[in-house]
């Protein structure tokens, strides 16, 4: 009887968690649908509604609006902050974008070291079926590797190895 009493609340908690994730996914998809139709303000609003729930896809969508100046004034610093939010929440394409931004200094201070780390982490976390995306990451990773000193490369490889064990980025990567 006691097991049933524990399982019931746990089951309800799981159901609640799954239902909120479905709402978040639906809001992102709603925003994406608007985005594809060129309804950028509506897309941004849907993503802003979803963002407090911690959805990485919505943070990426908001970043895109700032990066391209869609429904908001173009602001590469704000775009980089939103891409970083998506990256820290686990969105592989957010990780790739912040890596590219560090490579070119777009909205951030240029850093081949941070670019290399973020691009490498993006590759590690990219879906296996995203072959073109993963191949492009490898090209960019190799470009950044050539820009690093031996000491920077060694430090970067340690960060990547640590990430593989903990799935957490060091503090220095949590800020722009």
PLM features: what roles do these ranges have?
Residues 39, 52-57, 68-70, 75, ...:
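Short helix-capping/linker turns of helical repeat alpha-solenoids
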Residues 27-53:
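Alpha-helical segment of the N-proximal tetratricopeptide repeat
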